[in-house]
């Protein structure tokens, strides 16, 4: 199992403090401190691949664990990414934004060659690009 601590800038995936704060808030609402945010890539969507977000208590052997400290400076949350999904997410940014269209988690993925209008589906072009 690979473990990466983003707070020390050792990962090529950026997990923002804003996203960590929102994850911590949602975990508190669920009243289960064992929850972690899992980001995954699956086949589907209008562009070929789609992002998935879920809470998971289980950490698998092939998961990369990214730990991000929250803005309070005291708590932190874990982001889990399986090995297949990780290859499509290198150099990506996982953020949480608030705007006129509402609040949402977003992934800014430089590996995505095309994206759909909703931002949850993408294609990568040639696998040689990874």
Curated annotation (Swiss-Prot):
Keywords: Iron, Iron-sulfur, Metal-binding. The keyword Metal-binding applies. PROSITE patterns: HESB (PS01152). InterPro entries: FeS_biogenesis, FeS_cluster_insertion, FeS_cluster_insertion_CS, FeS_cluster_insertion_RrpA, HesB-like_dom_sf. It comes from the Bacteria. Binds 1 iron-sulfur cluster per subunit. One of its GO terms (molecular function) is 4 iron, 4 sulfur cluster binding. Its cofactor is iron-sulfur cluster. Iron-sulfur cluster binds at residues 46, 116, 118. It holds the Pfam family Fe-S_biosyn. One of its GO terms (biological process) is iron-sulfur cluster assembly. SUPFAM superfamilies: HesB-like domain. PANTHER family: IRON-SULFUR CLUSTER ASSEMBLY 2 HOMOLOG, MITOCHONDRIAL. Belongs to the HesB/IscA family. Homodimer. Required for insertion of 4Fe-4S clusters for at least IspG. This is Iron-sulfur cluster insertion protein ErpA. It comes from Legionella pneumophila (strain Corby).
């Amino acid at each position: 199992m690979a473990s990466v601590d983003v707070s020390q800038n050792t990962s090529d995936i950026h997990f923002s403090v804003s996203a960590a704060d929102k994850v911590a808030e949602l975990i508190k609402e669920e009243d289960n401190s064992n929850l972690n945010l899992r980001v995954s890539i699956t086949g589907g969507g209008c562009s070929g691949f789609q992002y998935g977000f879920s809470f998971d208590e289980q950490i698998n052997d092939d998961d990369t664990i990214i730990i991000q400290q929250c803005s309070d400076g005291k708590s932190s949350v874990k982001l889990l990414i399986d090995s297949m999904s990780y290859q499509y997410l290198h150099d990506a940014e996982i953020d949480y934004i608030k705007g006129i269209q509402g609040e949402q988690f977003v992934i800014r993925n430089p590996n995505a060659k095309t994206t759909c209008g909703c931002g949850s589906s993408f294609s990568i072009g040639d696998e040689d690009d990874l």
